Amino acid sequence: MPVDKFLARAGGQRTLSRFQDSLCDFLATGSSRSLCGTSLDFPDRVLVCTEGPAGMEEASSPSFRQATTVEGMVSPEDPTLSKEGLSAKGPPPSPVLPPFRRKCRKCGICPQEEEKSGFSLRFGQRPDGDPPECASPEAFAGPPRLLSSKDTEPGEPGGSWVECAVETEVENMLFSKDGVAPDSLDHLFEFPGLFGGEPLSLVTQEPLQSPALYPEVLTEDSTDQQEVQPAFVVGSPGTPPDPVGPEDKAQSGSRMELEQGLSAPANSCASSPEPLGGLDGAPLEQRRPTHVKKRPWTSPDDSSQDHAEGASKKDFPRLEARVPRGVKTVYYVYTGSGIRLVGAASSSQPGQIEPLEELDTNSARRKRRPTTAHPTPCQSDPSETENAEPHQQRAEDPGEQGMTPLDAGVRSTVVRAMQEVLWTRAQELPDLALREDEVEAIAEGIEEALFHLTQDTNLRYKNKYRSLLFNLRDPRNVDLFLKVAHCDVTPNNLVQMSSIQLAPKELSRWRDQEERKGLDIIEQQQKELYRLPASKLTHKGEVEIPRDLDQMLTLEDLMEPIVPRECSLQPLSTPLEDTTNWHQHHQCDSNCQICTGGEEGRKADDGSQPELQVDISYNVDRKSSTKLPAFSGVIMNREENAIQKAPGPAPASSPEVLKVGETPPKEPQDRLQMPAGLKNAPPSPPPWEGSLDMFSIKHFRAKAQLISGHSCQLVQALPDVIRSAGRLPPSHVWDLLDSMGPSKAKDICVIRLCPHGSRDIQNYRLLYSYLNNKQCHCLATVQQVKMVLLPLPAFEPLPARLRPLGGPGLEITHTSLLLAVLFPKDALPDTATSIPVSNKVPKTVSFSKRVERILYSPEDRRSEATSSPLEEDPKQSLARGSLAPRSVCAPQSFPRGRGRQGPGWGQWSPEAAWCYSQHPSSAGPVFPGIGQGQHLHRASCFHHDLLQHLKVLVTMSHQFQASLWPQSQDSLPPSTVVSAVPDPPGPSLGPMDGGGSNCPPPEGSDPLEPPEHEC
């Protein structure tokens, strides 16, 4: 039955007019009371409902679903409302309804039984069509004020609740008979059979007031949002309607069912879960909040007064519902075609509406993006706790949700700083035509790419910004700035470049060099680890583990016992090419076997058998004894064996030889025995022997062996004790070597320091390990010589800077040793009277005048023969620098031009002078079978060759005897030589033969040429 017919039957035309007046008064006063204090203009018909997450279901309850509208709610639920009361009681007879009749004047809120309404609608449109004064989400947050039965005073006419309920229901709902579009959702609000069986639909009067605030209303795709559902349920509590199926409308179409629903008991639990009906028919449940709080709600007394003035006049308490965690307040709008979703109330910004997101999309985005560095809201306030999760979700997606003011300030600062740097660099390059707007665009593009890369203004964002700013501001990095200015590098590629790629070329080149140096140092350290000896840490520090003597042997020492004995018995076809016969002219020579006695001494220490090698030379003597006389062969063999093998001190009966099990061979009985003094003679002394006192290492004895150089002059100037003066870097030694002039460079020599005995080996190794680990050289304190000690690891060759000095050098398979480089100073002491070694005989010597007297004055020679140097003490002879008696080893030389004089008394022919120059020992011993005096022969004469050979052997014999003779003895050993001074030649002008007879020169011969003598 239509409403107008129903009212006409109940009270006539008067009742209908009073109803219309009451409706206008209610809409004029109720909207101003419920919507005061709002700042936004919402649509006329907005429904506010409390929704939970989609898919959450709870236990069903027969109560209705809560619905909240923008402008008020009507609760038709009352136990007094029944079918009989509705049909029996008519409208009140009062002519005019008061405008504030339905307002609760006691507390401004609705009673508890009216708060449990299952269906309530309210409109904000006034009858005259004006929009509401204010509409704010704050007004929608809590349950709005509901109409109560108490608004009808008992004394007032027509104050029954039945009349109030009917009027309230009609006042808040406008129905129309017009048809509904097929796609409209107005069928949710149709009440078939309620008033005469005609369906009633909701009437939409005006379009939206502000379409810009609700963009989703203008799109048809927004109707597909199914995450949140509308909050309307029409029908009985037990059977919520299904808006899809048409048969559901028939089930709830009876008037009796609606009346039973309206007369539901008022004591239903307000906090019980309620069924939630959606647009798609999916059942959802929502728990109504159980805690509400009152707070003042200002309302104007008169609707015509201003809102600010009215708000200050009167305050009313308001119900504020606390939304549980995870629940949002959702706003809908009624349109001509249905209900549109507006959005949810913003928890961080009051009075604003934020768009909703799909739950699946939001959760997936939360998993993909890391949590931002924004501070978490304080948990002390429950309202802030409930709003923490939406705030975090909005901050995770800056593009969709927007930036915070802090992020916006940081980004603007970065753009401004980048623009200033680029513009400053552009001013430094006048050739670069770059406008200010272009610079600003480049800076904004770089910042946008940087923010897109980091997705936040976090620490990574700031570090990358500083790196870009530093490299763009660097004046040396012009290439990077030009690439950015010419857009050769895009902003996306620029922010993804590493610090090495952004750096200038000079810095990159320097980094590469430093990396190579580091790698070289690491490789060198790894190589040195294999060369260093094993060491251990004790309470005294790092101590080197001593090795056995077998481990110190070289490959050459290990290969010597393997050589077969027959291979070493080969005869020597030619004599050794050495300078032993010139030993009287030098102090130390690398080619002299006497000077390099350390090599033979080392072989003797390794267990070699010198007596066996002496016997080998005797076998050679037997083969050559047929050519030479017996006496000459014996002397030559003795001298050669003594020179080559005498440094070996081990006798034939030494324990080492007996330990091996070899017996010394028997000497032949027909040969002469060596003197006892030569057999037991000690080895030749090394160039230097003393002790070393270096750093904190205990001093030890050592001896020197020449390695490089041609002079032992500096070696002999060394003191007995050498002490350390400090450490030097390796480069200092080479600089000192380069600073030496040519005159001093010839005196530089390198010696090898060897431990003197087994007790000194450990300290010797400690000194080597110390210098090798420190990678330094040791400077010694010597007054007249600059001495530098340097370590040389095993199997390493001599440094290339020391090889040009000459000398024997080092063997390839040598152990770890200490080398000493000796540099000369300004002056040397007088004690070092040795002469540098030279391949040629010096032109002048200290006794050249005496030699001339001997050669050219026979009387003087005879007088000198009486005072033979044999009577002189050997110590005095050695003190003058000669190791042999002067009568035997004195070199003789002729002055230039003297050989061209004619033969006469006291003068010799040039050939005779040449013969004497070849044989400096003019006074040779007299042997049986050879006459006294000198007998000069031709070069082709057999006796001439024999005489030269014998003279050389005699000279070598006396040199060796003088060098081996101990200094403690006062007299020379007995010699088989009868006289070392020959008789002077006779008065004849010609030479003498072997028997002392004169050999007259043949007729017609040149007197300047030597006479030919047929033998």
UniProtKB/Swiss-Prot annotation:
Domain TFIIS central: 410-530
Entry keyword set: Chromosome, Differentiation, Nucleus, RNA-mediated gene silencing, Spermatogenesis
Gene Ontology molecular function terms on file: protein-macromolecule adaptor activity
Entry GO terms, CC: chromosome; nucleoplasm; nucleus
Residue segments, region Disordered: 73-97, 118-159, 213-320, 344-406, 643-685, 858-906, 967-1015
Domain SPOC residue range list: 688-791
SUPFAM superfamilies: Elongation factor TFIIS domain 2 (SSF46942)
Extent of Basic and acidic residues compositional bias: 304-320, 388-397
Pfam families listed in its UniProt record: SPOC, TFIIS_M
Gene Ontology BP terms: cell differentiation; DNA-templated transcription; gene silencing by piRNA-directed DNA methylation; spermatogenesis; transposable element silencing by piRNA-mediated DNA methylation; transposable element silencing by piRNA-mediated heterochromatin formation
Phenotype of gene-disrupted mutants: Male mice are infertile with spermatozoa completely absent in the epididymis. Male germ cells show derepression of transposable elements (TEs) and DNA hypomethylation of TEs.
Location(s), subcellular: Nucleus; Chromosome
Comp. bias (Polar residues): 373-382, 967-978
Function: Protein adapter that acts as an essential executor of PIWIL4-piRNA pathway directed transposon DNA methylation and silencing in the male embryonic germ cells. Recruited to young transposons, which are specifically marked with histone H3 trimethylated at both 'Lys-4' and 'Lys-9' (H3K4me3K9me3), via its association with SPIN1 chromatin reader, and associates with the de novo DNA methylation machinery and repressive chromatin remodeling complexes. Following this, PIWIL4 engages with nascent transposable element transcript to direct piRNA-directed DNA methylation.
Known partners and oligomeric status: Interacts with DNMT3A, DNMT3C and DNMT3L. Interacts with C19orf84 homolog. Interacts with SPIN1; promoting recruitment to transposons marked with histone H3 trimethylated at both 'Lys-4' and 'Lys-9' (H3K4me3K9me3).
Name of protein: SPOC domain-containing protein 1
Protein source organism: Mus musculus
